[in-house]
């Protein structure tokens, strides 16, 4: 929270009371409502929220179907002012596989693959799901990552990446 110049600190117990009262899904509308309430509860001109957290999603290997959990880094940053201004940033970081197009073009026997990180940040006007941003990140790569792969899966992932150099 922002503090008036005459204040030396904030009312920390109000934060804990406020957080204990908020047991809601993490959605833009609930975040905005919570920040609007917090700016008044804390008697502040401006409040900020800055969160980074992992989200674990189930992934099935492409051939064997073996299931595993894969982690993605999610970001939520928001600001709300007493006069109603707000700014929100939602983002994800997803690890993917990329096959080098140049390497594929100049090589007769294959191409090199790399693990890459795709970062997406948006300032949404309405609710956006982290899973949708993760899907966009994975589709922008040669291949998504899988937590568990057997030989048949490895072959599939390698060939898929080779057919989709990015």
State where each predicted segment sits:
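N-terminal intrinsically disordered, cationic/polar leader segments
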Residues: 1-166
């Amino acid at each position: 929270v922002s503090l008036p110049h005459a204040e030396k600190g904030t009312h920390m117990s109000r934060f804990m009371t406020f957080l204990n009262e908020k047991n809601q899904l993490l959605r833009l509308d609930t975040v905005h409502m919570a920040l609007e309430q917090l700016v008044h509860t804390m008697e502040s001109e401006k409040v900020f929220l800055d969160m980074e957290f992992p989200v674990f999603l189930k992934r099935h290997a492409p051939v064997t179907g073996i299931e595993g959990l894969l982690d993605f880094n999610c970001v939520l940053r928001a600001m709300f002012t007493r006069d109603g201004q707000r700014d929100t940033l939602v983002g994800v970081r997803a690890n993917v596989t990329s096959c080098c197009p140049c390497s594929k073009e100049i090589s007769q026997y294959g191409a090199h693959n790399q693990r890459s990180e795709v970062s997406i940040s948006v300032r949404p006007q309405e609710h956006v799901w982290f899973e949708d941003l993760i899907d966009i990140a994975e589709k922008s790569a040669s291949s998504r990552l899988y937590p568990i792969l057997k030989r048949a899966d490895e072959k599939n992932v390698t060939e898929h990446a080779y057919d989709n150099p990015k």
